[in-house]
Amino acid sequence: TPARLLYNLPVAWYLRALSSFEPVAHIDLSALAHNLGEVRRLVGSRVSVLAMVKADAYGHGAVAVTERLVSQGVDAFGVATLDEAERIATVRAGSTCVVFGGISPDEAARAVALDCDVVTDSRDVVGALAAGAVASGREARVHIKVDTGMHRLGLAPAEAVELARFAAATTGVSPVAVCSHFAM
C-alpha cells in the first residue's frame, strides 16, 4: 500500500523532502485595500492609521504592501529595524515611518537621514539623534517606550517621564508619543 511504502522510506528521503519545501503566502492587494476601507469606516476619518510592515510585511512583501497602502492614504508605517525602513523608503511617499525595534546610538544619523521616527528608551539614543538632527538641519522624532510587561524595550513609567522631559529639552529632538507593547 502507498502508506506502507512511505513508512519504509529512509529518513534521508524525508529530510530531503522537508528541506525543499518553501512555504508561500500570497496577498490580495485589492482585499487589503478593501479591509483598510472597512477599518477606516469603523474608526472614522479623524483616526490615523499606522500599518505594520515589519518582517517584509509578515512575509507578504513590504514594498508592494506599502505602495498599495500609500495609495489608500495610510498615514504611517511601522518597521522593526532601519534596514526595513530603508527598503520602503522610496515607496512610502512622505508617510511617517516608525522604527519600533529600537536603534543604537551609532544608527542615529542613519535614522535621521531616513526621516524615521524612533521608538527608544535610551538617553544615549536621544542624544545621538539630536547630534544627527543638528548636523543635518533636520528634526529627530522620538517615541518614548514604557515597559508594561514585555521586558524587551521600555522604561518604568517614572523613568519614561524623565526621558520624555529630557527629549523635549534637547535641541533637534521632538518627542512625539509615549508608547507601550502590552503583554498578553
Question: Where are the model-predicted features located?
Answer:
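Intrinsic disorder/low-complexity detector
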Residues: 9-10, 37
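Ala/Thr-enriched low-complexity intrinsically disordered regions
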Residues: 1-3, 12
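Short, positively charged and aromatic/hydrophobic N-terminal segments
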Residues: 7-8, 14
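Active-site-proximal beta-alpha core segment in soluble small-molecule metabolic enzymes
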Residues: 19, 23-26, 31, 47-184
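Generic cytosolic/nucleocytoplasmic N-terminal low-complexity/intrinsically disordered segments
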Residues: 6-7, 34, 53
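Intrinsically disordered, low-complexity peptide-like regions
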Residues: 5-6, 179
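Glycine-rich phosphate/diphosphate-binding loops that line cofactor/substrate pockets in enzymes
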Residues: 36-47, 138
